[in-house]
Regions:
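Catalytic Tyr-X3-Lys loop
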Residues: 106-125, 145, 169, 221
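Alpha-helical segment proximal to the catalytic Tyr-Lys
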Residues: 133, 177-182, 243
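Residue(s) in the substrate-gating loop at a strand-loop-helix junction
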Residues: 149
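Short, small/polar-rich loop/turn modules that mediate ligand/substrate recognition or access, typified
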Residues: 181-185, 190, 245-247
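Active-site helix of classical SDR
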Residues: 128, 165, 173
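Conserved glycine-rich Rossmann-like NAD(P)H-binding loop of the short-chain dehydrogenase/reductase
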Residues: 33-49
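Conserved glycine-rich cofactor-binding loop
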Residues: 17-18
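Short C-terminal tail/terminal secondary-structure segment
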Residues: 2, 102, 154, 235, ...
Length: 266
């Protein structure tokens, strides 16, 4: 991508207080975005740091607290862009999981599935619905980028409900790409292991360290991807550089899908 691919864009990023969401917000700001609407669910202090990084790049940063599982909150997030008359790119990054060994079928309940689907599948749907008119108002086709997971393809990941929810998100990406063309493009990025505090928080430091070491040792590219590594691909999908790309699920996993099985899933 060329510097300035997001020149004067109005961008919405959900789940942008830390990790991949923050990296996406900072990157679009560095690419010239005019406005970055930063959604977060709980941590206002972390979200403010994301806003600070965007403002340091010259973008206007707007913070909107809200849970994407709540349709009213989704409409409130979209309303923050209303004064600008459009949304050029929507990054549906908010997500959640429940860490559980796949073989431990008694370790997750039906409610766990519903809780994950509410955020990981219904949330992105509600965000697209809330933002549709503003995405269609963009001077070029508006772009939606979903944050899915390599677990959607391999069935691996932090838990069975998580992998299943991301598989559903990939299928929904295809459905929406057909339904919303030609005025809106819809794609998904499917990360593998990302070296962020999210894993350590859910699995513990020791397990996260093993995952990191295993990624470096066993993936074909011998790397543990950072949030910035994944953000580069997500930002590509939201940019004019991918203007002829829709309905794509882009695997950004250092080659994990070629056969490497993460320790957490064994």
């Amino acid at each position: 991508m060329a510097q300035g691919d997001y020149q004067d864009f109005v961008v919405v990023v959900t789940g942008a207080s830390t990790g991949l969401g923050r990296a996406v917000a900072a990157e679009v700001a560095s690419q010239g975005a005019k406005v970055v609407i930063i959604n977060y669910a709980r941590n206002a202090q972390d979200a403010e740091e994301t806003a600070r990084q965007c403002r340091a790049q010259g973008a206007e940063a707007i913070l909107v607290q809200g849970d994407v599982a709540d349709d009213d909150d989704c409409r409130r997030i979209a309303a923050a862009a209303q004064p600008y008359g459009r949304i050029d790119a929507l990054f549906n990054n908010a997500g959640t999981t429940r860490f559980n060994r796949h073989a431990d079928l008694d370790g997750v309940s039906g409610q766990d599935f519903l809780d994950l689907y509410a955020v990981n599948v219904i949330g992105p749907y509600q965000m697209v619905r809330a933002c549709r008119a503003l995405l269609e108002a963009a001077p070029r086709p508006g772009a939606v980028v979903m944050t899915a997971s390599i677990g959607a393809v391999t069935g691996l990941g932090s838990s069975v409900p998580y992998a299943a929810s991301k598989g559903a998100l990939n299928t929904m990406t295809l459905s929406l790409a057909r339904a919303l063309a030609p005025r809106i493009r819809v794609n998904a990025v499917c990360p593998g292991f990302i070296d962020t505090p999210w894993f350590a928080k859910g699995m513990g430091e020791a397990a996260a360290d093993r995952m990191r070491a295993s990624a470096v040792a066993d993936t074909p590219l011998k790397v543990a991807s950072t949030a910035e590594d994944i953000a580069a691909s997500a930002v590509f999908l939201g940019s004019p550089a991918s203007r002829h790309v829709t309905g794509e699920t882009l695997l950004v996993d250092a080659g994990t899908h070629l056969g490497f099985a993460p320790l957490a899933a064994r």
